[in-house]
């Protein structure tokens, strides 16, 4: 589990990191179109049995130096970060504070948030569809879309006629939605044959059992017949509804008429 710093303790550490940034870290042109970022991350493994704190400096999407609590000091990621790493590592009091962040910030915040974050689960939504519409026996890409789930641990497997497919798989990798949910696309490259059944199976901690969604390879004529059948049923129901409406309206009109003899 990874938490980005949004609370007061870790945010204070990030603020201190920014204030202590050496001038050498900004040797490039600091015009508005460039972006400097500092990210504090608490990594938890099996609760708080093992906790790792990272302070990452990023310039224009490129990380150039970082503090790693497992290492105990700053290490340069690129040549740009070497002067910064050397500068920070000489600040003894500051380095002691960073090394203590695992206990003073990460573990502290975990205890506060554990009750509502760790047990939280959201079931994934699973859909299967071909990437393009074309006749059978042509190369196609079947897409299994797994969306809006939490936590991020998920396993997606493809089957053809009950046999697992391990070749021809393409995945987008885990995508963060920004609202504590994730999404993932796992695609299968194949040449569908008539009558074949493709199944996407999804396993996730929120599910009591795996979810299986099927896609059946059908010829264009079979699909047209199926759509014609569905259209016929819908049309029949419309005529039936119209007939019942006319019938009950006539019945109501007749019940409202009184016999002529009673008017005299």
From Swiss-Prot:
Instruction: Outline what the protein does.
Output: Involved in the presentation of foreign antigens to the immune system.
Please list where the region (Connecting peptide) is annotated: 216-226
Q: Which GO terms describe its cellular component?
A: cell surface; external side of plasma membrane; immunological synapse; late endosome membrane; lysosomal membrane; MHC class II protein complex
Q: What's the superkingdom here?
A: Eukaryota
Span-the-membrane segments of this chain are 227-248
Matches recorded under InterPro entries: Ig-like_dom (IPR007110), Ig-like_dom_sf (IPR036179), Ig-like_fold (IPR013783), Ig/MHC_CS (IPR003006), Ig_C1-set (IPR003597), MHC/Immunoglobulin (IPR050160), MHC_I/II-like_Ag-recog (IPR011162), MHC_II_a/b_N (IPR014745)
Q: List the disulfide bonds.
A: 42-106, 144-200
What glycosylation sites does the entry record? Answer: 46
Protein name, entry field: Rano class II histocompatibility antigen, D-1 beta chain
* This protein's UniProt keywords: Adaptive immunity, Disulfide bond, Glycoprotein, Immunity, Membrane, MHC II, Signal, Transmembrane, Transmembrane helix
Residue ranges, annotated region (Beta-1): 27-120
- How is this protein positioned relative to the membrane? Single-pass type I membrane protein
In the record, what terms sit under GO molecular function?
Answer: CD4 receptor binding; MHC class II protein complex binding; MHC class II receptor activity; peptide antigen binding; polysaccharide binding; T cell receptor binding
Outline which residue ranges sit on the Extracellular face: 27-226
Segments carrying the region annotation (Beta-2) are: 121-215
Alphabetized Gene3D superfamilies for the sequence: Class II Histocompatibility Antigen, M Beta Chain, Chain B, domain 1 (3.10.320.10), Immunoglobulins (2.60.40.10)
Instruction: Answer yes or no on keyword Transmembrane helix.
Output: yes
Q: Which species does the entry assign this protein to?
A: Rattus norvegicus (Rat)
Sequence ranges on the Cytoplasmic membrane side: 249-264
Tell me the lineage of the source organism: Eukaryota, Metazoa, Chordata, Craniata, Vertebrata
Signal peptide stretch: 1-26
Q: Residues in domain Ig-like C1-type?
A: 124-228
Q: Which GO terms describe its biological process?
A: antigen processing and presentation of endogenous peptide antigen via MHC class II; antigen processing and presentation of exogenous peptide antigen via MHC class II; humoral immune response; immune response; inflammatory response to antigenic stimulus; macrophage differentiation; myeloid dendritic cell antigen processing and presentation; negative regulation of inflammatory response to antigenic stimulus
